[in-house]
Amino acid sequence: MLAVLSPAKSLDYESPLTTSRFSEPALMHESALLIEQLRQFAPADIASLMHLSDKLAGLNVARYAQWEPVATPQNARPAVLAFNGDVYSGLAAQDFDDADLDVAQQHIRILSGLYGLLRPLDLLQPYRLEMGTKLGNPRGKDLYAFWGDIITGHLNQALTEQGDNVLLNLASDEYFKSVNVKRLAGRVITPVFQDEKNGKYKIISFYAKKARGLMARYLVKERISKPEQLLDFTVAGYGYCPELSTENKLVFRRPEDLSQ
């Protein structure tokens, strides 16, 4: 089973690293093309393009200027320890041991607007470039056009290498749109996490993001290899709802009293 995650906007380059291991991103040449284009923008242009404050736009212009075509432990850190949002709070990779990291490296991929597709230990330099950014480029009007079938091709390769054809979609719609499902050599299973609020169940973004990370952690820690094993996921109070689920859409619900 191969799981895909979204990246996070917030980054952590301050906390102590919990591993000295790292790997090199496979698509750095493509990333360098995007950086070259982003370096042409003034801070005001970045603010407009990405809907950022002037302060954040200035920070990211500086990041693009400092980005290097060769990542090293001196200018980057493993992606799974650099991303710092709700998904990664649930994943909590800081306590992974070497065996866990081996499993994660083989069975988890992170979609990225700048890097295309990352393994957990791939070195990540600070950046901001969401997949939905309407960045016109020589390949088309946006990043979906830029990446085309490149991401899908690398996912197919990863599916082959890890031994089956099941892709666990733990990414947001914005990021999973970068995958050409028609050309994907695998079955896509998408978990849906709903929380109860005022007596009604719905997807609450903060909780759903963290739950995706929790399921990725479950995959790693429990060495999950078969889709039916996912049905036993009961972490943080969630439970599988067979009456709402289909073969490829797995619905998990959590009562309000268990979300506190």
From Swiss-Prot:
What is any one of the record's Gene Ontology cellular component terms? cytosol
Q: What is an annotated GO biological process for this record, any one?
A: response to hydroperoxide
Which branch of life, at top level?
Bacteria
Which HAMAP family does UniProt cross-reference here? UPF0246
Hey, which family's this protein in? Answer: Belongs to the UPF0246 family.
Name it: UPF0246 protein Tola_0968
